[in-house]
Amino acid sequence: LGHQTVIDMERPFVTIPARKIGNKFRAAEAAWILSGDNRVSTIAPYSTKIKDYSDDGEYFAGAYGPPFRDQLPYVLNCLRADSYSRQAVISIWRPRPYSSKDIPCTVSLQFLIRHNRIHTVATMRSSDAWLGWVYDVHNFSCISAFIALHLKGVELGALFLTAGSQHLYEGNTEAAKKVIKCYETEIVYNKELTWKGMKPDD
């Protein structure tokens, strides 16, 4: 409970061979969020099971794209007006959420600029350490990089990801044990994956 992970968003991506990651889905989901989309048809080609979480088969009730799209102008204006503002927050959680198969796991994203670096505080009500965490870290880093590119001259800082409940489902326990066992000897740093040189339209 109340678990926090701190990640340097400037560091190269790290992969472990024992942990198979859907890299196409990871990239597609980040682009899907940044575009403000919530349609099933645009993300389903990259995941065979994701459509099962849609209530009507057409849209996702808890998609992060629409709140990101709608609140991004406020965040950019807020940080441009006062780079030390503590009010640059995107709210993902819905007041009085209705019953749905797609309740958002993330409550909010707060963006803080300190010493010319943008830091992100992600507050999550629930975080699946196996299935969701690796994608959440990537998505929040992409969102932060997107904002930094639009602010110009701002570098990426740290991602503080705090989860009310960070958990591992029983069905993923054995796979997680294998990753922990090989972590020391099979960690791979991919130095080619970096945000450097990107532009807002990339």
Predicted regions and their residues:
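Terminal, non-catalytic protein-protein interaction segments that mediate quaternary/complex assembly
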Residues: 1-202
